[in-house]
């Protein structure tokens, strides 16, 4: 089994080497693609846009992103996937030959296990929601037309073009092996397709959100403690990253599995708090919600405020404090987009309307 994995990993290393040598001029493009494909953009950019265009799509998108990334964490703990940037330097597979020269980049040195790819899985799931939702909006109750069929082809071609670029980006940056990005894409689509059949997420109570958040945290923590009790070190990848990353400053605490877990759980709980708040009911359930200028104002204000939130980085000197602050910061993202900003704008527009009378 180990020999087969070594052959598979060697194929991945050769693929990375080929891309880095033959597409050296595309370095900036691949780095940009990897940055854009980060799941953070689904929370800070795509969610507020889609929520204020059509609430159900935004809610579905956030659930797919959060639960998909949670499954990604569990899969990584089970599969113990290597990453190219440390495997090529750590393995004895090349003991009788020269070690392939693999470049590293500022976004290469992620600290979690490599399989499946979180970038590929997140992008596949989130963009699947956007494509299928867009097609559902344009399809409506009408029969399929030539224009709709063209839109269908264009959107799916665009979808697979995005997935291809994300996969090539992760391989180029030596962050993942080819089989890991393929597994990520398939897993992301599976999660998104599953949630397309779950209707309970659109009217879930705050109690249900709390229970699900607690379950996801409890399961992950219990699974971690169980494997640790069996002698399995689930933080083995952090040592690999610190040892083999070209520059220490490229190793970031926010790429650890627990950092991802706390950010996702905070986001989910924040959505539950927002959707069940009085501010949301007062601002998003009235006639004002149907106004296009109001929705556009909510989108612009949300993107601006969330950009400020994103620039605030919790101190990472103490891990426990970092995780708690990451949880709280993530919870404010959907809460601000869904309830706080619409409520403030509704009050402001209401007062302006009264003065005009």
UniProtKB/Swiss-Prot annotation:
Organism of derivation: Rattus norvegicus
Residues at which substrate binds: 83, 170
UniProt short sequence motif Prevents secretion from ER, positions renumbered to this chain: 354-357
Positions in the Lumenal compartment: 1-28, 82-117, 169-170, 233-254, 313-320
Entry GO terms, CC: endoplasmic reticulum; endoplasmic reticulum membrane; membrane
Pathway note: Carbohydrate biosynthesis; gluconeogenesis
GO molecular function: glucose-6-phosphatase activity; phosphate ion binding; phosphotransferase activity, alcohol group as acceptor
Enzyme Commission (EC) number: 3.1.3.9
Protein's UniProt name: Glucose-6-phosphatase catalytic subunit 1
Family: Belongs to the glucose-6-phosphatase family.
Membrane side Cytoplasmic: residue ranges: 50-60, 139-147, 192-211, 276-291, 342-357
Functional description taken from the UniProt entry: Hydrolyzes glucose-6-phosphate to glucose in the endoplasmic reticulum. Forms with the glucose-6-phosphate transporter (SLC37A4/G6PT) the complex responsible for glucose production in the terminal step of glycogenolysis and gluconeogenesis. Hence, it is the key enzyme in homeostatic regulation of blood glucose levels.
Catalytic residues in the record: 119 (proton donor), 176 (nucleophile)
Cell compartment(s), UniProt: Endoplasmic reticulum membrane
Domain of life: Eukaryota
UniProt keyword Transit peptide, yes or no: no
Membrane topology: Multi-pass membrane protein
UniProt xrefs under SUPFAM superfamilies: Acid phosphatase/Vanadium-dependent haloperoxidase
Sugar-modified residues: 96
Record keywords, A-Z: Endoplasmic reticulum, Gluconeogenesis, Glycoprotein, Hydrolase, Membrane, Transmembrane, Transmembrane helix
């Amino acid at each position: 089994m180990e020999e087969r994995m070594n052959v598979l990993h060697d194929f991945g290393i050769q693929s990375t080497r080929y891309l880095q040598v033959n597409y050296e001029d595309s370095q900036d493009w691949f780095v940009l693609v990897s940055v854009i494909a980060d799941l953070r953009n689904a929370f800070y950019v795509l969610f507020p846009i889609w929520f204020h265009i059509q609430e159900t799509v935004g809610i579905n998108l956030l659930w797919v992103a959060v639960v998909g990334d949670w499954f990604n964490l569990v899969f990584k703990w089970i599969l113990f996937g290597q990453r190219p940037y440390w495997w090529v330097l750590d393995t004895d597979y090349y003991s009788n030959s020269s070690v392939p020269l693999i470049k590293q980049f500022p976004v290469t040195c992620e600290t979690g296990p490599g399989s499946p790819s979180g970038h590929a899985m997140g992008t596949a799931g989130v963009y699947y929601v956007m494509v299928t939702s867009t097609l559902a909006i344009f399809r409506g109750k009408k029969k399929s037309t030539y224009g709709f069929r063209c839109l269908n082809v264009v959107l799916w071609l665009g979808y697979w073009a995005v997935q291809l670029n994300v996969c090539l980006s992760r391989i180029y940056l030596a962050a993942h092996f080819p089989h890991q990005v393929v597994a990520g894409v398939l897993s992301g689509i599976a999660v998104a397709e599953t949630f397309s059949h779950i209707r309970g997420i659109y009217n879930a109570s705050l109690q249900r959100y709390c229970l699900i958040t607690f379950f996801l945290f409890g399961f992950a923590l219990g699974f971690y403690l169980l494997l640790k009790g069996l002698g399995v070190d689930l933080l083995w990848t952090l040592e690999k990253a610190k040892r083999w990353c070209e520059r220490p400053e490229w190793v970031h605490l926010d790429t650890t599995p627990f950092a991802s877990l706390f950010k996702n759980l905070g986001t989910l709980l924040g959505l539950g708090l927002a959707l069940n708040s009085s501010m949301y009911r007062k601002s998003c359930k009235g006639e004002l919600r149907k106004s296009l200028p109001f929705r556009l104002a909510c989108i612009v204000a949300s993107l601006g405020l969330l950009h400020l939130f994103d620039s605030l980085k919790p101190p990472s000197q103490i891990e426990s404090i970092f995780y708690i602050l990451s949880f709280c910061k993530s919870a404010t993202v959907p809460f601000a987009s869904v309830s706080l900003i619409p409520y403030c704008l509704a009050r402001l527009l209401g007062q302006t309307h009264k003065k005009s009378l």
